[in-house]
Amino acid sequence: MKNRDFEKAVVLIPARMASTRLPGKPLADIGGRPMIVQVALRAREAGAERIVVAVDDEQVFAAVQNAGFDVMMTRGDHQSGSDRIFEALQKADPYGKAEYVINVQGDLPTIEAETIRASLRPMENAAVDIATLTVEITDEEEKTNPNVVKVVGSPLSETRLRALYFTRTTAPYGDGPLYHHIGLYTYRRAALETFVRLPPSPLELRERLEQLRALEAGMRIDAEIVRSVPLGVDTPHDLEKARKILAGRTL
């Protein structure tokens, strides 16, 4: 399935070697391929026509290049993935042909193609600067877990929220659904250019959530509601889960 909007988009996948819980994470073997290559394959399955991996390590660069994907070496001192993908964007698309920039985290080797495609849907509304994803929380423990970021949003439809806030606490108060934020973003190119030039904001620093910088600057973020949270690989246990998931499907 090809999404016509992918013709106007570039998928950028940041990869960093510096992981304290899982050293060498981008090169971890999953199904005979490095994890970062598995993520790029998921983007290809979603219908992406231009996929660029942004790396800070020669070994990762070589692994991605050998797999046939575009790869850009970036500086090692970036403070965030957004800064890294912006540097890669400037190198990969210097003439500004891409209207949308999809930031897929490099530790999501089992992400579903439909989940990636869903991040483009809010861009149908020209007022939206940034799109992201969310899932309704069904696990009671997640509702109070500060490691599960919640989207506080105003419903626009059964499948979309306008994000008003992101928080690690349990919110909003009262009866009704709570939503687990998925850190995959689609930016309008101009919005990404604006975002990376903004200084860290007070709420961003307080909650330790980069996306609050955009909201505090008056940018609009809409969140598409999807079916499930993709597995983020941060620990050896996560890595084993990812291996089992991909072993059960045809690659």
Curated annotation (Swiss-Prot):
Biological classification of the source: Bacteria, Pseudomonadati, Pseudomonadota, Alphaproteobacteria, Hyphomicrobiales
Name of the protein: 3-deoxy-manno-octulosonate cytidylyltransferase
NCBIfam families in UniProt: kdsB, PRK05450.1-1, PRK05450.1-5
GO BP terms in the entry: CMP-keto-3-deoxy-D-manno-octulosonic acid biosynthetic process; lipopolysaccharide biosynthetic process
GO CC list: cytosol
One GO MF term: 3-deoxy-manno-octulosonate cytidylyltransferase activity
Family classification: Belongs to the KdsB family.
Keywords tagged on the record: Cytoplasm, Lipopolysaccharide biosynthesis, Nucleotidyltransferase, Transferase
Places the protein is found: Cytoplasm
N-terminal signal peptide: none
Pfam families with a match to the protein in the record: CTP_transf_3
Organism this protein belongs to: Agrobacterium fabrum (strain C58 / ATCC 33970) (Agrobacterium tumefaciens (strain C58))
